[in-house]
């Protein structure tokens, strides 16, 4: 292969083209087509995805044709599962746990050198590949229930990276900060997409629109909190053919403040709002009807109107359809929701229940950081941290899918049970490493069950 061909292959591993690489590399790891989801098939899907990457490892090597070409103590096909299996101990302990008490095993410095030859996009590719292969497309009234949110991850201090560096104040140590934007399936309890940004350059709205635009999911309801309130976000979701349900501000700085709404604690008002960035005299007259027309200034990002226009260019409008719903949550507080769900199919009580389901992504972040051990990184370099972030996302999905396949109901049907996720992670990690056969895995998971109590 020519040097130009190698360079072209590496360009394919950029985030914007990663989906193409994933589809090309591993089409055979699909669980769709009637196969029953169980621990064995989940494990096979992940192993197949790793093998597919190994078959095309030059795509994910920092120097194609030079890196990962010889069979060393840390070959490519071992480094990938090794990083996936990280527990949170020291690197030396991780090596002993994975490779056994073998005096001939590689050292921690040899591993660091080897992982530097693997692009961070390798683990991003693995995450997307595996997630697609186990996607059962579970629907809620015809829709995928997806939540979007972000979470910060503190990493080792590096003053040379001003986009993520925070100097210590009041005696605190300096640190760098990454922001993980994630899209989470609330029915399958798995991450379906993620995008990592440096904290000082973080833009949650840009991350949301990127994940929405590149998704292959046909029909979905996207749930989000107040940080995602913007006309541009709503427009991207609407143009995707999806539905949205987003909590918005009640004060003077949000979408609701620019509309004439009832002065009551509970209402459900539909809107057909035409957006424009034109400000001719004729348009100014239309804008007086603020429940039907809205001016978008050129300082606000909106991707569906021309960036600039000349004085005599005709006005361009973008029509956005939504409802604003308000309801009390206590004697002194109300929630305000913007959604484009049909009012007859999803009345007020459904809106309340759906928004409460968004909490699932918050719980997932806690499990990702504490139970899976994302807070216990084995790296200082951002490139290595990115490897571990997507490795943890992959293993989170792996563990969730296996525990979901072992849901138990008592004979008297008093409660439905689920597996304790903290214990399950330890068991599933052993299963991934090949130390536990499926029957033993399921028997062990059944020992650590908790009742599912509705409403909690």
Where are the model-predicted features located?
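Short Lys/Arg-enriched helix C-cap and helix-to-coil transition segments
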Residues: 121-134
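Short boundary motifs at domain starts and secondary-structure transition points
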Residues: 134-139, 328
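Extracytosolic and intramembrane catalytic regions of membrane-associated proteins
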Residues: 166
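Conserved beta-strand elements of the Class I
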Residues: 144-146
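Single, function-defining residue in the core of a domain
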Residues: 8-89, 97-98, 105, 110-118, ...
